[in-house]
Amino acid sequence: MYRYKITIEYLGTHFSGWQRQAGVLSVQQILEEAIYKFSGEQVTLFGSGRTDAGVHAIGQIAHFDLSKYLEPYKIIKAINYFVRPYAVGVWNCELVSNNFHARFSATSRHYIYRIVNRTYPSVIDLNRVWWISAPLDVLAMQQAATYLLGKHDFTSFRSSSCQSKSPIKTLTEINIIKEYEEIKLYLSAPSFLHYMVRNIVGSLVLVGKNIWQVEQIKNVLDAKDRKVAGPTAPAFGLYFIKAEY
């Protein structure tokens, strides 16, 4: 068997998420069907991150196996042909060891959350950013974010449906940058809990609006109770950037 690693970008707006589910449209399904159309093989695609409905990706990594060898550049062209007209594209493909696993071999995952902070909405980036009209104090958000760096129990920031065995995660990066009218939050960790990034963003926005004091983020973290954290930020502002191996 030949194992291929592909790098994918997609707009999550019209998808139920990455993972295949009965009765709804997923990114995994679209790609698996495209691979079947040119290879004649039923494959299972394994992704590095299982993004939720509405979440986008710039560098999602996935792997699949084929019984026959195909040139990687031909796979890119074939997949991109057959995924039309969906907002999905493959921009890299390489042959890898059969020991490689897109999910379990990953050592780090990186996300970005985009906020447009101005009095009027972004038409060009509709469903691609979270528009917040109230001015945000980015410095306060940055100060609050430092409480989340490192290894912690992130129970307060996980969803009620999270299936992870442990709430203990290690946040290796949380960086907040303002570029003109856009605020970008970069978060990195070996792995994340379900809704963890979006719940963190929702809580930091409360700090940015001066509804919460900076220290409240530490209180929320220490409480280990989802009910005391802020609202879940909308899915459409979140992007899976890349996975590292």
From Swiss-Prot:
Q: Which residues bind substrate?
A: 111
Lineage, top-rank taxon, reads Bacteria
Q: Which reaction does it catalyse?
A: uridine(38/39/40) in tRNA = pseudouridine(38/39/40) in tRNA
Q: Could you tell me the keywords of this UniProt record? A: Isomerase, tRNA processing
SUPFAM superfamilies found in the cross-reference section: Pseudouridine synthase
Q: Spell out the InterPro entries in the cross-references.
A: PsdUridine_synth_cat_dom_sf, PsdUridine_synth_TruA, PsdUridine_synth_TruA_a/b_dom, PsdUridine_synth_TruA_C, TruA/RsuA/RluB/E/F_N
Active site location = 52 (nucleophile)
Coiled-coil positions are none
Q: Does the keyword tRNA processing apply?
A: yes
Enzyme group, top EC level?
Answer: isomerase
For the keyword tRNA processing, the answer is: yes
Q: Which GO terms describe its biological process?
A: tRNA pseudouridine synthesis
UniProt cross-references to HAMAP family, sorted A to Z: TruA
Q: How does it assemble?
A: Homodimer.
- Family from the record: Belongs to the tRNA pseudouridine synthase TruA family.
Q: What is the protein's known function? A: Formation of pseudouridine at positions 38, 39 and 40 in the anticodon stem and loop of transfer RNAs.
Q: What is this protein called?
A: tRNA pseudouridine synthase A
Organism the protein comes from: Rickettsia typhi (strain ATCC VR-144 / Wilmington)
Gene from which this protein is expressed: truA
